[in-house]
Regions:
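N-terminal auxiliary segments of SAM/dcSAM-dependent transferases
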Residues: 1-74
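SAM-dependent Rossmann-like transferase core, predominantly class I methyltransferases
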Residues: 55-146
């Protein structure tokens, strides 16, 4: 089978199980299984797959079919302008949380130097994103669990 065929088959399975974005998830999971960027996958959809790669991909699809969040399967979540490592011990950054960053950036001028504290940092997405945008400021992130940091 080639990439296009396994993506279509997997997307059908995900769609039947009411997974949002079944094609996108299938492409991302095949990219993970093959250890290539999604862009490279999309330019090589006719590439024949090895049996071991199909087996690895099917295991990922099965996890997704069971409603495991795609971010946990991939091991990261895109947030603001970066990717953040996530697993079952860390809450997945939500897209609407990016509004917090937008509001903070309105308050803190680029030229200013602030000390920012992030309590209950989890993945660290908020503090890291803010400090990357306001590089003259300093951030401290704390969490009860060392697993999160």
């Amino acid at each position: 089978m080639n990439c296009s065929e396994v993506i279509s088959n997997a997307a059908y399975i995900l769609k039947e199980n009411l997974i949002k974005n079944p094609y996108l998830d299938s492409e991302m999971l095949l990219s993970k299984a093959l250890k290539i960027k999604r862009e490279n996958l999309l330019t090589n959809l006719n590439m024949k797959l090895k049996n071991k790669d199909i087996i690895k991909f099917n295991k990922l699809i099965e996890r997704r079919r069971k409603k495991e969040p795609i971010a946990y399967i991939l091991g990261y979540k895109s947030f603001w302008k970066s990717n953040f490592k996530v697993n079952q011990d860390v809450l997945i950054p939500r897209p609407e949380t990016e509004h917090v960053i937008e509001e903070v950036l309105k308050i803190i001028p680029k030229s200013a130097s602030y000390n920012i504290l992030d309590v209950g940092t989890g993945s660290g997405c908020l503090i890291v994103s803010i400090i990357l945008e306001r590089q003259r400021s300093h951030g401290t992130a704390i969490d009860l669990s060392l697993i999160h940091i």
